[in-house]
Structures are given as structure tokens and as C-alpha cells.
From Swiss-Prot:
Family: Belongs to the Syd family.
Purpose of the protein: Interacts with the SecY protein in vivo. May bind preferentially to an uncomplexed state of SecY, thus functioning either as a chelating agent for excess SecY in the cell or as a regulatory factor that negatively controls the translocase function.
Top-level taxon of origin: Bacteria
Organism: Yersinia pestis
NCBIfam families: PRK04968.1
Localization (cell): Cell inner membrane
Name by which UniProt lists this protein: Protein Syd
Organism placement in taxonomy: Bacteria, Pseudomonadati, Pseudomonadota, Gammaproteobacteria, Enterobacterales
Amino acid sequence: MDLNISTALRSFTQRYIDLWQQQTGHLPASKELYGVPSPCIVETGEDQVFWQPQAFLPEATLTNIERALEIQLHPDIHDFYTQQYAGDMMADLGNHRFTLLQVWSEDDFIRLQENLIGHLVTQKRLKLSPTLFLATTSSEMTMASLCNVSGNVVLEQFGSDKRTLLASTLSHFLDALRPVLPE
């Protein structure tokens, strides 16, 4: 049975939080997000913030992108980016390490939409089929993305048609991820 995106994302997020609490005794922490306002912040330390996910309110969609580019986005991407505010989360899948991108705040949601538009415009200019990024890797040119046509999750080289299947659906991708702590 295919989990819905909301359930799969909540499940992965909880596994990530559980790992942090087991390994460190506290909620996930971020030095990179220190000083950046967010509804996720539970506590601010000397040089880091401790966070936990919060409901994405008010409800939102990525219809601004659809209108701007006259494209219908795969429904899974709406669900993925509008379920929760959270910090980015690290995970492994096979021999790949990913940073799963999340929305930190309302301002971050605006930036995300601008970046997705830029990504889609670049793909259109290069005559590539549209994808929507989900996670980064250690290489600036490689990312995990949702294929807007098939709904597959692929490992893609930015600006190239080189793509490797990671999972048949986004929910399968999220379910297969193994959370890891940042190094």
C-alpha cells in the first residue's frame, strides 16, 4: 500500500527527531538557522536553535508556480512542501546522502517558490522534462527530484538529462530514507 505524502513525511520527520533525541538527548539543532525566525524554534542556544516541526499554517499550495509557468505540478510536490515547517533533515538512501529540503518559515516558502520557478525555467530552456527538487547532495550539481510527469523520485544532474531512479513514488522515497545526524 502506498502511504500518502503527509503520512510518509510525518513518519520520516519523527524518525529524524527520535534519532536526534536518542543520540544527543535533545531536539534537532541547527547552527545554520540560528537567528532566522521560524515557528519551529523551540529554544535558542548560544549558537544554534533547537526545533520541532509545526503545522503549515495558513494552508498553502504551489499554485503561484503553476500560474507563473502555466504548468500543472504533480500533486505530491504540493503535499511535500506545504505539510509542515521544519528544518532541513539529513538522510541516507543506499550509498547516497541527502539533505531533505523543508520550509522553515513563510519567508522561506516564498524563496522556495522562486527557486522552483528558476529550476523549471532552466529545464524548459534546456528542453528537459520538468522535475522539482526535494533534496540536495554533497555535490552542488546533483539532487533528488520529483519527476513532474511520472511522479518518480530521481537522482539528477542539474542542467542534464542524466537521471537515475531512486523510488517509484515520493512516499516510497520518504519511507526508504534512513535519518542521519549532520557531521
